[in-house]
Amino acid sequence: MGPLMVLFCLLFVYTGLADSAPSCPQNVNISGGTFTLSHGWAPGSLLTYSCPQGLYPSPASRLCKSSGQWQTPGATRSLSKAVCKPVRCPAPVSFENGIYTPRLGSYPVGGNVSFECEDGFILRGSPVRQCRPNGMWDGETAVCDNGAGHCPNPGISLGAVRTGFRFGHGDKVRYRCSSNLVLTGSSERECQGNGVWSGTEPICRQPYSYDFPEDVAPALGTSFSHMLGATNPTQKTKESLGRKIQIQRSGHLNLYLLLDCSQSVSENDFLIFKESASLMVDRIFSFEINVSVAIITFASKPKVLMSVLNDNSRDMTEVISSLENANYKDHENGTGTNTYAALNSVYLMMNNQMRILGMETMAWQEIRHAIILLTDGKSNMGGSPKTAVDRIREILNINQKRNDYLDIYAIGVGKLDVDWRELNELGSKKDGERHAFILQDTKALHQVFEHMLDVSKLTDTICGVGNMSANASDQERTPWHVTIKPKSQETCRGALISDQWVLTAAHCFRDGNDHSLWRVNVGDPKSQWGKEFLIEKAVISPGFDVFAKKNQGILEFYGDDIALLKLAQKVKMSTHARPICLPCTMEANLALRRPQGSTCRDHENELLNKQSVPAHFVALNGSKLNINLKMGVEWTSCAEVVSQEKTMFPNLTDVREVVTDQFLCSGTQEDESPCKGESGGAVFLERRFRFFQVGLVSWGLYNPCLGSADKNSRKRAPRSKVPPPRDFHINLFRMQPWLRQHLGDVLNFLPL
């Protein structure tokens, strides 16, 4: 499920060595800033300017030519004086279905832009954004959406122009940047069948902009942890080290580390490249996964220090030793940056491994690949590096179904003549992820690699993983699903939300039976994977009272129909038993690949973002059935049917007395209806091959299993039935205070 990431880290920093015999003039000061030299004043040395935060150098760098003159990369004319200019953030070109203020041509550091939507549209993203000192906006792209499309409105990032205004299945939208801005992300996106746009959100940025380490580390860490979890959904948790993923024989990761050693990289910067790569190796081996690591240094030519075909590539000590022995002087005669040759070395390694294992074998096809390329700038010899990337994609058979088997992350270091277009061209394009970055210096790079895979912060993040293969059992497809019974007869369902807690409905316990006699079946009861658990504690919502409104003529009322069960023992994780993701938690945030700083409202806007949201519940026989959750105006029309139910609600005048905003509504169109006995089970959605519980089955107007003892037999209601079927599910977004009160020590909740 998760991608094995090919991290493509491009690093640019030119700090320098003072040479006693200058060949180029030394009158190169910058007003208000400083500069460094990669190799003193000698030909081939790169001069790099720096300015205080909030300013950027113009030009960014100069190269000492053999003629003894400074050349400004990319300049069409000679610049006599280097200056520090104020950083600006790009302005919106347009904002659909709303307004933004103030309207400026560009925005200064610290400046804000605010967004409001027209009536009938809901704002997604950040209502206010601030220009940061790196030339990037904080927050997320603001979008005014009415939820009418198959895919949500993809929005228009600041500084971008979009063509395409239809959001149905198969529709495409295209983006370009205004003025001299550079586009990163996908220039074209397609609305896919799962309601998600292909590719990566396009961002228009100033050529001099860069990324802060605190933004890059979580972005890389989230993607990498997702890749690790997806390599094989089976993992074990060790208390001392947090989550560790044990990949079975069928799962393997090849990690390729490519380090630039060209002349424009100083020896000190190369040492930091090595230290950063060592940090990455240390972190990745701490996950106890089956991993092979390749080490390649390059300048004009590549040098393979460790191949994934070498058995030592699976030994952390041997890999780190290879990194420590990497010698800067091995490439002292190579002045160019041949990124193509470095990537082609990876291709040749893959090709040799494919020949050994066999192209059609699972041993080859199940390997996931991650490439990390550390370089100082734009490739300048050997041809286009994208050609090598295309060959890599071809040999790995990367298509829509196998897209997760390759991730390329392009990270540049240093505000030099970094080619954003080349970085973006090489980096992978995946929904909800970024793969192209530029960091300000090697210190920032080191900081990113220190924090991107902090194992202690990944505890219990792998939730919502189901086995979707054709031969998977029903329980493997929904491993969080449990059955709850007093003594022998099954009465309700529930969902594992951690290794010891089950979420279910309060009305399952309204008879007040001794809970010590109850049992919870976890896993597949028909196989060795099923296990019966005692209940240590039952937490019933104090607000639940089915007869609370009986004196109003409402015979049954299901407000606050929610309960938690603490099992007497922890559940051992397996493909048959695994928690589902609860929205508004850090665990779900990682699964959704959302940035740090996301809120509970952000999760609700992402998961329940249309007027009709496809969802599922689990039937008595364990199969997954489909429903559509109605939102907005459609929720109102869905709930209004309750007024026709005269048996339970003979004197009902206000539907909201029965159907409060605590409930989600389904049952229209061709929806399945839950049976009696399915109450308490999860109502869940799929996003990016992960599953998220947004509700739990509570009550309804029709029982399709009435009169049948066969769990596989369900009867659809006649079209003439009055009232027509409607089903109501507790909305977990409306139960946050109660959930946080009782699960605050179990899950990591996000701000509301």
From Swiss-Prot:
Record localization: Secreted; Cell surface
Annotated Sushi domain residues: 22-86, 87-146, 149-206
Main location: secreted
S-S bonds: C24-C64, C51-C84, C89-C131, C117-C144, C151-C191, C177-C204, C463-C581, C492-C508, C584-C600, C638-C665, C675-C705
Gene: C2
Cellular component aspect of the GO annotation: extracellular region
Description of post-translational modifications: Cleaved and activated by different proteases depending on the complement pathway to generate complement C2a and serine protease complement C2b chains. Cleaved and activated by C1S following activation by the classical complement system. Cleaved and activated by MASP2 following activation by the lectin complement system. Cleaved and activated by GZMK following activation by the GZMK complement system.
Protein name per the record: Complement C2
Glycosylation sites: N29, N112, N290, N333, N467, N471, N621, N651
Short motif (MIDAS-like motif): ranges: 260-264
Biological source species: Gorilla gorilla gorilla
Any single GO BP term: response to bacterium
Domain notes: The MIDAS-like motif in the VWFA domain binds divalent metal cations.
KW Cell membrane (keyword) present: no
Domain Peptidase S1: 464-744
Primary enzyme class: hydrolase
GO molecular function: metal ion binding; serine-type endopeptidase activity
Residues in the signal sequence: 1-20
PROSITE patterns in the record: SUSHI, TRYPSIN_DOM, TRYPSIN_HIS, TRYPSIN_SER, VWFA
Co-factor(s): Mg(2+); Mn(2+)
